[in-house]
From Swiss-Prot:
Residue stretches making up the S1 motif domain: 623-691
Role this protein plays: Involved in mRNA degradation. Catalyzes the phosphorolysis of single-stranded polyribonucleotides processively in the 3'- to 5'-direction.
Source species of the chain: Aromatoleum aromaticum (strain DSM 19018 / LMG 30748 / EbN1)
Keyword Ligase tagged: no
Name of the protein this chain belongs to: Polyribonucleotide nucleotidyltransferase
Coiled-coil regions, chain positions: none
GO molecular function term, any single one: magnesium ion binding
Entry EC no(s): 2.7.7.8
Record-annotated KH domain positions: 554-613
Predominant cellular place of this UniProt entry's protein: cytoplasm
Keyword Magnesium: yes
Cofactor(s) listed: Mg(2+)
Amino acid sequence: MPTAIKKTFAYGAHTVTLETGEIARQAGGAVIVNMDDTIVLATVVAAKEAKAGQDFFPLTVDYVEKFYAAGRIPGGFFKREGRPTEKETLTSRLIDRPIRPLFPEGFYNEVQVIITVLSLNPEVDPDIPAMIGASAALAISGVPFDGPIGACRVGYSGGQYLLNPTVEQLKASELNLVVAGTEAAVLMVESEARELSEEVMLGAVVFGHQQMQVAIRAINELVEVAGKPEWDWQPPAKNEPLIARIKELAGAHLEEAFRITSKQARTQRINEIRKQTFGVVADGVEVPPTGNELKDIFHDLEAGVVRSRILAGEPRIDGRDTRTVRPIDIRVGVLPRTHGSALFTRGETQALVIATLGTGRDEQIIDAIAGEYRESFLLHYNFPPFSTGETGRMGVTKRREVGHGRLAKRALIAALPADEDFSYTVRVVSEITESNGSSSMASVCGASLAMMDAGVPMKAHVAGIAMGLIKEGNRFAVLTDILGDEDHLGDMDFKVAGTENGITALQMDIKIQGITKEIMQVALAQAGEGRIHILALMKQALASHRGEVSEFAPRMLTMKINPEKIRDVIGKGGAVIRGLQEETGTVIELQDDGSVTISSVSAEGAQLAKEKIEAITAEVEVGKVYNGTVVRLLDFGAIVNIMPGRDGLLHVSQIANERVNNVADYVKEGQAVRVKVLETDERGKIRLSMKALLDQPAE
């Protein structure tokens, strides 16, 4: 029997166990992580050789949730897990981002990391165990990897940081931050906050990095007893003569090219320089250098040109200094028949953002392994190939689009109105029509404007900005509002979104080690300046939300009824509610607590439906006079309808002062009559009288 090797450590209020050696033994590395009964299996398999002609690092990370982990059977016809959910896609990205920069430069062997959720404690999100498991599996596999990493979640409540709060604790927390890093440095941050200060956010990152050291130590201890031999892999030796030759041929030309401020013109010129340089280098050589070798050297030369100029204090690629935001142009209400729209342009990045209002029936129903839930705020980010002047496939939503949409959504949640104040379902779509860096933050700005334009009573405008970093030794420069090239050639991508009052979302991806607390402090402060500048421009374009929703949006009315009256509104087989909806042209939604939502394109129709529901659910009052209709004659009286769904008995003795021998001599079916309520009993039966009225008017 195989023997499992285990390492256990306390992690906040949780106990975490790392285990290897019993399951998935044919994988390059396999670790089971148990965090208070949330259990994941993380496996790593790597190809021993890179494919011929491979010119990038083919790392794949797949996080997979199994319904059996929560004791559930999947819905749908096939009753099995299907394509990745949004949660699976986002968690896969969360794992990928901190481990990718730790593989050595020039390592092009295919690596696949698969994390499978085997058991779920509803109070423990599997994402942190999954990140720890992926790190541990890589560490014991022997694959070239400069880890391990640790990861943890940080909450903030009552002025105190919480380590790995439960799902229930997070509901009351002002912060939901995931941080990952090595023993020496933070590599990745993903967070959502309720307008917190830069100091609190930075403190959370530092707190998380300190606390994750226990996980890193446990992984290192596991490697000592269960680690496989490290691969005998060496990076390709640098061809110094070739590097010098390419620099001689292309260096001066690249210096000039990176002074071209237009992205398309600059890209075209760089491509020309690359083509000319490679042609000259390969000409007349017996063994020409490989494409990978040439590409890597040219990339390093590009990076050197851009980075050295910025660190020397020279203007950036587009002529700006390090703190200036690109020119911004804002238009709202650009699409006449949509509920709300905005066109947000920042330099060569542009987002056309549309807000649509719907009813409760438009909420997204999500069948997660922990149980079904509904989302009333949706944000979708689309990045078509034409936005960068390229061709490409359409149709399938890419992981990057899911991730950018989620970041923008998290940035806006803190500013949304409460459900009881605004019961609409809101869907925002960001169409990126031009891109040269920071399109996700343009989506945040555009979404805030579009929702305000749609009449959504946002608490405040939300703006986002992307920061970059260039660092060489002890010299560094933080860049405000980075371009695509600065993101590609820099050391950090640092996105911050928030209101005037504080930060609502922070995302950080760091490609190098050695980013200190002081550098992050400078970056956050500089991002705050940029955010306030953008917010001022947004307020100039649209200071507050529209006074009312678009004429094309559904009108919503909400009311509360006695839950015991719900069946009266629905009627037998749904007949009453169907009739109401057809008569008034509305959609009526009932909740178990008696909440009623009425939606209609017509405000008059919604009001009419509300009045009719009030009539149906009104309580019959003893002593009150009603105008009723005779619905049926009996030998001993008549049945009279006095309110929608409420009938009473008009006894023969209560029809007239004299003796009534034949009811039909006094009332007919369909006849309008005035009656007084004499009595109602505990079973809801109603006794009526015509005789008691005499000449009393109907109330």
